[in-house]
From Swiss-Prot:
SMART domains: DAX, DEP, PDZ. Residues 176-192, 200-214, 526-555 have a biased composition (Low complexity). The DIX domain promotes homooligomerization. Residues 1-85 form the DIX domain. Interacts with CXXC4. Interacts (via PDZ domain) with NXN. Interacts with BRD7 and INVS. Interacts (via PDZ domain) with VANGL1 and VANGL2 (via C-terminus). Interacts with ARRB1; the interaction is enhanced by phosphorylation of DVL1. Interacts with CYLD. Interacts (via PDZ domain) with RYK. Self-associates (via DIX domain) and forms higher homooligomers. Interacts (via PDZ domain) with DACT1 and FZD7, where DACT1 and FZD7 compete for the same binding site. It is a peripheral membrane protein. One of its GO terms (cellular component) is cytoplasmic vesicle. It comes from Pan troglodytes (Chimpanzee). This is Segment polarity protein dishevelled homolog DVL-1. The modification Phosphoserine is found at residue 194. The gene is DVL1. Residues 400-474 form the DEP domain. Participates in Wnt signaling by binding to the cytoplasmic C-terminus of frizzled family members and transducing the Wnt signal to down-stream effectors. Plays a role both in canonical and non-canonical Wnt signaling. Plays a role in the signal transduction pathways mediated by multiple Wnt genes. Required for LEF1 activation upon WNT1 and WNT3A signaling. DVL1 and PAK1 form a ternary complex with MUSK which is important for MUSK-dependent regulation of AChR clustering during the formation of the neuromuscular junction (NMJ). Ubiquitinated; undergoes both 'Lys-48'-linked ubiquitination, leading to its subsequent degradation by the ubiquitin-proteasome pathway, and 'Lys-63'-linked ubiquitination. The interaction with INVS is required for ubiquitination. Deubiquitinated by CYLD, which acts on 'Lys-63'-linked ubiquitin chains. It holds the Pfam family PDZ.
Length: 670
């Protein structure tokens, strides 16, 4: 004979009840179910049954027609009996019973009409805990009594909108009364204060059964008080987040025939506050999700194909995803969109940014460097092509609204500031620079950017890879900050040139140049003294000229051989034995050979004075012994290089090269 199993839940009781009806599952009705529950006040309950809806899936359906057939799942019926609002029984039996004759009522944690299954309330215990000395008849009687008391209490709480103290005064009972009314008032409150806990503990009874029940009820209320406060705090949080993060549910169907993998990583976010769910952690390039573009990191994964991901652990979600991807056919992902995880246009909270001290000098230099940048309209007017200057392409690439994602990235637990991915650079070049017929040409262009120093790898790799992180090179980022005084203060990095001589002194430039120099500027005072002149022995001039040559050898390798010759010439300046001097070609100047006698004859007065009185300035009449060859028109007389004292030859040669070849002299900073 066919029979039907009906599993029903009574309010928030943890353990469900099971009854069997001698009726086929497809023929069982609500009237058959109520006949089995004849010992319960079925007229005071609403009947909800587990049912399947085409739009929402599994739901709880209320059935009130006695002739309606009950929905059946796997040969059984699942039902919930919820106390109806306004239902109450005879109130006279409540006032006549003493408090010690009744067991404690059930502890209610949900509101009226709460149709959640009992699994949502794991801390609720049965009302008959610790009452093993009752008989079956006493249990049934006390069960009916507590039902009546609870219905009366809830009716009074709903119809009376006054606080607990007002209701107590309306009843006319003192605060320490041990009557049923006071007990119901305490149990119906959401938060039990310490004084009410004390009054509850002072309610004594002659039976051990009632005392143990009171202790259990008091313990439950304390736990319930803490849990409700946590729920209140969480509800205040949700009221804030719901107003700012409204969800938008999107269903995305992916064609897995064009892509080899799904390309997502999922993260489980379960915690004590119940904020559970499976979230999209990251999206990998080349996958089906990245190609679609509608799913972003931070979205909540609700359903994949027909599998619901709610209340699913992270391991189960990974297993289900792998099984679905291994199958053929399209995949449908249902996600709840969240707000932008990386907002750019509205408020942001820089939680991950470190706090750095402010350097005023660096801030000023950075501001000054920005003032020398190219105007925006010049960059926007001229479109970028493959023939454009690489520096201009890189400058446009670094603009905030260029479309290239430049941000801090993590690599091997190292933060790389303002880094880009090689694949993004290639895509940006292929999209924004004209002249590339295919993408691999843009990749070659990106490789040339790395080769010329516009891009720089973290570990200085010279080969370009689309999977690596790159930063912009110092050549394009620090070019605006360069100036002529940016060298170090060491003597080996600077040219030590003697200042211009006194206007009354002979002009040091010879007639070897095809053009004439103007006279010295009138800014020098009449009493100007040349501190670069060496009045000591010949070795002093050699040291000074030697210092002036060292910077040239370090700054430009092309002038190293000429400077080495100058150093040798300066070292032998005291003897006057060297007469062959060379200069760089291409500037129109010539150096003429002079006999050794001319050098020794021109330098003999200064050499004798230096030998007789080292470290003392010679008398001025000695300057008249120089041979005057000629000078620029309107300027002082000019003497030949051979007439210059040997200890000053090296410094004067360096000065002549600087004045005669200015382009070569400043070629180091280009």
């Amino acid at each position: 004979m066919a029979e039907t199993k009906i599993i029903y839940h009574m309010d928030e009781e943890e353990t469900p009840y099971l009854v069997k009806l001698p009726v086929a599952p497809e023929r069982v009705t609500l009237a058959d179910f109520k006949n089995v529950l004849s010992n319960r006040p079925v007229h005071a309950y609403k009947f909800f049954f587990k049912s399947m809806d085409q739009d929402f899936g599994v739901v709880k359906e209320e059935i009130f027609d006695d002739n309606a057939k009950l929905p059946c799942f796997n040969g059984r019926v699942v039902s919930w009996l919820v106390l109806a609002e306004g239902a109450h029984s005879d109130a006279g039996s409540q006032g006549t019973d003493s408090h010690t004759d009744l067991p404690p009522p059930l502890e209610r944690t949900g509101g009226i009409g709460d149709s959640r299954p009992p699994s949502f309330h794991p801390n609720v215990a049965s009302s008959r805990d610790g009452m093993d000395n009752e008989t079956g008849t006493e249990s049934m009687v006390s069960h009916r009594r507590e039902r009546a008391r609870r219905r009366n209490r809830e009716e009074a709480a709903r119809t009376n909108g006054h606080p607990r103290g007002d209701r107590r005064r309306d009843v006319g009972l003192p605060p320490d009364s041990a009557s049923t009314a006071l007990s119901s008032e305490l149990e119906s409150s959401s938060f039990v204060d310490s004084d009410e806990d004390g009054s509850t503990s002072r309610l004594s009874s002659s039976t051990e059964q009632s005392t143990s029940s009171r202790l259990i009820r008091k313990h439950k209320r304390r736990r319930r008080k803490q849990r409700l406060r946590q729920a209140d705090r969480a509800s205040s949080f949700s009221s804030i987040t719901d107003s700012t993060m409204s969800l938008n549910i999107v269903t995305v169907t992916l064609n897995m025939e064009r892509h080899h993998f799904l390309g997502i990583s999922i993260v489980g976010q379960s915690n004590d506050r119940g904020d559970g769910g499976i979230y999209i952690g990251s999206i990998m390039k080349g996958g089906a999700v990245a190609a679609d573009g509608r799913i972003e990191p931070g979205d909540m994964l609700l359903q994949v194909n027909d599998v619901n991901f709610e209340n699913m652990s992270n391991d189960d979600a990974v297993r289900v995803l792998r099984e679905i991807v291994s199958q053929t056919g399209p995949i449908s992902l249902t996600v709840a969109k969240c707000w932008d995880p990386t907002p750019r246009s509205y408020f942001t909270v820089p939680r991950a940014d470190p706090v750095r001290p402010i350097d005023p000098a660096a801030w000023l230099s950075h501001t000054a460097a920005l003032t020398g940048a190219l105007p925006r309209y010049e960059l926007e007017e001229a479109p970028l092509t493959v023939k454009s200057d690489m520096s201009a392409v890189v400058r446009v690439m670094q603009l905030p609204d260029s479309g290239l994602e430049i941000r801090d990235r993590m690599w091997l637990k190292i933060t790389i500031a303002n880094a880009v991915i090689g694949a993004d650079v290639v895509d940006w070049l292929y999209t924004h620079v004209e002249g590339f017929k295919e993408r691999r040409e843009a990749r070659k262009y990106a490789s040339s950017l790395l080769k010329h120093g516009f891009l720089r790898h973290t570990v200085n790799k010279i080969t370009f890879s689309e999977q690596c992180y790159y930063v912009f090179g110092d050549l394009c980022s620090n070019l605006a900050t360069l100036n002529l005084n940016s060298g170090s203060s060491g003597a080996s990095d600077q040219d030590t040139l003697a200042p211009l001589p006194h206007p009354a002194a002979p002009w040091p430039l010879g007639q070897g140049y095809p053009y004439q120099y103007p006279g010295p500027p009138p800014c020098f005072p009449p009493a100007y003294q040349d501190p670069g002149f060496s009045y000591g022995s010949g070795s002093t001039g050699s040291q000074q000229s030697e210092g002036s040559k060292s910077s040239g050898s370090t700054r430009s390798s092309r002038r190293a051989p000429g400077r080495e010759k100058e150093r040798r010439a300066a070292g032998a300046g005291g003897s006057g034995s060297e007469s062959d001097h060379t200069a760089p070609s291409g500037v129109g100047s010539s150096w003429r050979e002079r006999p050794a006698g001319q050098l020794s004859r021109g330098s003999s007065p200064r050499s004798q004075a230096s030998a007789t009185a080292p470290g003392l300035p010679p008398p001025h009449p000695t300057t008249k012994a120089y041979t005057v060859v000629g000078g620029p028109p309107g300027g002082p007389p000019v003497r030949e290089l051979a007439a210059v004292p040997p200890e000053l030859t090296g410094s004067r040669q360096s000065f002549q090269k600087a004045m005669g070849n200015p382009c070569e002299f400043f070629v180091d900073i280009m």
